[in-house]
Amino acid sequence: MESGRLIFSTAGSGAGQMLFLDCGAGGGGGGVGGGAMFHRGARPVLGMEEGGRGVKRPFFTTPDELLEEEYYDEQLPEKKRRLTPEQVHLLERSFEEENKLEPERKTELARKLGLQPRQVAVWFQNRRARWKTKQLERDFDRLKASFDALRADHDALLQDNHRLHSQVMSLTEKLQEKETTTEGSAGAAVDVPGLPAAADVKVAVPDAEEPALEEAAAAFEEQQEQQVKAEDRLSTGSGGSAVVDTDAQLVVGCGRQHLAAVDSSVESYFPGGDEYHDCVMGPMDHAAGGIQSEEDDGAGSDEGCSYYADDAGVLFADHGHHHHHQHADDDEEDGQQISCWWMWN
């Protein structure tokens, strides 16, 4: 090996640089192998073997950093390249036009910008990831604003619901109180303990009408007494076989006195009274010695009938009912004595 020759070599992948300096055969200085001196150069900073151990990667990394690191690791041992503002502006404008990168478009952009197609593809990929992140952020902000608005509306509706519920409860209580008060006032109006009965109420009557009212009251009482007596006479003694109704009048004539009684819709108190329906016991004719029919011409009909005194007595005896009615009224009208008579329907 010639003296003063400097040899620089790289032995193997990742072996580092080797510097060999030959100082000649008679040169001074200690060394190995006749004054030969070996000097090992420094290893490269970004070596493949020590790259993973010497460089510490942060725990949280963005997709852009990962892609750039992967891309530039492939470019070793070349230097990491930065894009100029003009290149970034052109790429941004192209991304706004179309966010998807076709192969022809990628090659054209790389030629215009003086970059490799791989660099253009990585930039578009990173830019698309950032765009999606921004889009998600905008969507989240919009949805959050909508949620806040709906939450506020929900709270307002709940407050209105509580307010309306309280109003309904108060109105219901007032209505119940009003109904209770109305029922109490109605009951008090119907039954007032301090008011007198209707029979005890006295009506003020003028003095001029008092005699007429007294006479009417006396006549009414007398009529009631006569009606009671007539009912006693009409009763058969069996305790209720004779029925008296208010639909018709049974007139008993004794002189000038007339008694109003009722019996039309029920059976006659005589047994077998259906046979003698519409028969009348009229004034007795003393000359003929019998009882005339109610018809003026004296001719009997199928419905009406005429009985004589003896026959009438036999009729009453056969049915088991004996009714004795005597009336001694001495009053005479037109010189003739008027006997008592009965009439029924």
Curated annotation (Swiss-Prot):
Organs and tissues of expression: Expressed in seedlings, stems, leaf sheaths and blades and panicles.
Q: Where is this region: Leucine-zipper?
A: 134-178
Tree of life domain: Eukaryota
Cellular component GO terms, alphabetical: nucleus
Residue ranges, annotated region (Disordered): 220-241
Q: Which Pfam families match?
A: HALZ (PF02183), Homeodomain (PF00046)
Protein location: Nucleus
- Biological process according to GO: positive regulation of DNA-templated transcription
Record keywords, A-Z: DNA-binding, Homeobox, Nucleus, Transcription, Transcription regulation
Name the InterPro entries for this protein.
HD (IPR001356), HDZip_class_I_plant (IPR045224), Homeobox_CS (IPR017970), Homeodomain-like_sf (IPR009057), HTH_motif (IPR000047), Leu_zip_homeo (IPR003106)
Family, per entry: Belongs to the HD-ZIP homeobox family. Class I subfamily.
* Protein name per the record: Homeobox-leucine zipper protein HOX16
Q: Does the keyword DNA-binding apply?
A: yes
Gene3D superfamilies cross-referenced by the UniProt entry: Homeodomain-like
Q: Which GO terms describe its molecular function?
A: DNA-binding transcription factor activity, RNA polymerase II-specific; sequence-specific DNA binding
Cytoplasm as UniProt keyword? no
Q: What does this protein do?
A: Probable transcription factor.
| Residues within the DNA-binding region(s) | 76-135
